[in-house]
A protein has these predicted regions:
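N-terminal helix-turn-helix DNA-binding core of bacterial DNA-binding proteins
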Residues: 1-29
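A general secondary-structure boundary signal
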Residues: 1-9, 41, 58-60, 73
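Active-site micro-motifs of SAM-dependent methyltransferase domains
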Residues: 12, 39, 68
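Residues at helix-coil transition
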Residues: 12, 42, 78-81
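Residues within the helices of the helix-turn-helix
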Residues: 19, 38, 58
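Canonical helix-turn-helix DNA-binding module
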Residues: 24-51, 55
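Basic, amphipathic "hinge/linker" alpha-helix immediately C-terminal to the N-terminal HTH DNA-binding motif
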Residues: 52-75
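C-terminal regulatory/oligomerization modules of transcriptional regulators
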Residues: 71-134
Length: 134
């Protein structure tokens, strides 16, 4: 479960550092987070690089193998939107994803490869599409 949440945080929220992952609402313990990051790097889902501005920090990014998880996360979000009235995904976003899923997957993939995310930042997917997100 934790590994999927780390991948989700990269794709949906643009998190990249140990500290950012640690701040997630789910409250992962530091030792579990460290272990999962090592596993994700070892299995080729993430790559670890020095932080561009602070060489004492490391940033994590999805590899091609990791980017291939985007469709799975979109399907989980779609399922959640259908079955959980408390879901955080805007309905207009879900509708746009379902309208042309392959196009949206490509757009998300390109955005994440550039260091962006679906929901956070001025260059996020929802910002470029004009979708409101809380």
């Amino acid at each position: 479960m934790w590994s999927l949440l780390i991948v989700r945080d990269i794709i949906y929220f643009g998190k990249k550092t140990f500290g950012e992952f640690l701040e997630s609402d789910e409250g992962i313990a530091t030792n579990i987070l460290a272990s999962r990051l090592v596993q994700l790097v070892q299995t080729g889902i993430l790559e670890k690089k020095p932080h561009a501005m602070d060489k004492r920090k490391e940033v994590y990014a999805l590899t091609e193998k990791g980017l291939d998880l985007i469709p799975i996360l979109l399907e989980l979000a779609n399922w959640s939107a259908q079955h959980d009235p408390q879901t955080g995904a805007p309905q207009v976003w879900i509708a746009m994803v379902n309208e042309d899923k392959e196009k949206m997957i490509r757009r998300i993939r390109e955005t994440v490869q550039r260091g962006g995310s679906i929901f956070v930042g001025s260059d996020s997917v929802v910002s470029t599409l004009g979708v409101e997100h809380e």
